[in-house]
Amino acid sequence: MGNVFGSLFKGLFGKKEMRILMVGLDAAGKTTILYKLKLGEIVTTIPTIGFNVETVEYKNISFTVWDVGGQDKIRPLWRHYFQNTQGLIFVVDSNDRERVGEAREELMRMLAEDELRDAVLLVFANKQDLPQAMNAAEVTDKLGLHSLRNRSWYIQATCATSGDGLYEGLDWLSNQLKNRS
């Protein structure tokens, strides 16, 4: 009987956990975002070959964030991280108009995967501090987000170096997690 109350208590007051996969083309800002969330500071990054994983505590939720390298040669490895992913953060360099079509192809390829069918999608339209950056509405259009059916998605304009928009994105993810449990 005590176990029942223990579970109930943990459900009401305990920490929730969410497994997040963060992907996007190379140089979109994934690693900068991860460490801005984790440490609150800008770190010097090099291209990620493989992955970085960190736990980010926010609003009584423990987000385990997997930041996976985005270079074209290693994108086929993304699928090895799909299992048990509850939330997908897709990071887009809003200033890279030449590769936004490539970003859309990679995103749509991933969203077609059965293992990600229940994952919610958060798009970070990153590098908003740059003068030529596409705004969130333009990125939404270029990625074809309005065509998504049967998937919860949200786009957030961000600047990884200042942190602008990052916690608003986590707010949306935490609300999605609460609504599903």
From Swiss-Prot:
Lipid tethering residues (N-myristoyl glycine): 2
Enzyme class, first EC level, given as a word: hydrolase
Enzyme Commission number(s) from the entry: 3.6.5.2
PANTHER family in the record: ADP RIBOSYLATION FACTOR-RELATED
Membrane topology, record value: Lipid-anchor
Family: Belongs to the small GTPase superfamily. Arf family.
Ligand binding (GTP): 24-32, 126-129, 160
One Gene Ontology cellular component: cytoplasm
GO molecular function ontology, one term from the record: GTP binding
Protein name: ADP-ribosylation factor 1-like 2
Presence of keyword Nucleotide-binding: yes
Catalytic activity: GTP + H2O = GDP + phosphate + H(+)
InterPro entries reported in the protein's UniProt record: Arf1-5-like, P-loop_NTPase, Small_GTP-bd, Small_GTPase_ARF, Small_GTPase_ARF/SAR
Protein function: Small GTPase involved in protein trafficking between different compartments. Modulates vesicle budding and uncoating within the Golgi complex. In its GTP-bound form, triggers the recruitment of coatomer proteins to the Golgi membrane. The hydrolysis of ARF1-bound GTP, which is mediated by ARFGAPs proteins, is required for dissociation of coat proteins from Golgi membranes and vesicles. Involved in endoplasmic reticulum dynamics during embryogenesis. Also required for adult germline function.
Native source organism of the sequence: Caenorhabditis briggsae
SMART domains: ARF, RAB, SAR
Activity regulation comment: Alternates between an inactive GDP-bound form and an active GTP-bound form. Activated by a guanine nucleotide-exchange factor (GEF) and inactivated by GTPase-activating protein (GAP).
Keyword set, alphabetical order: ER-Golgi transport, Golgi apparatus, GTP-binding, Hydrolase, Lipoprotein, Membrane, Myristate, Nucleotide-binding, Protein transport, Transport
Subcellular location: Golgi apparatus membrane
Lineage of producing organism: Eukaryota, Metazoa, Ecdysozoa, Nematoda, Chromadorea
Example GO biological process: mitochondrion organization
Superkingdom of the organism of origin: Eukaryota
Region (Important for the stable binding to the membranes): 3-16
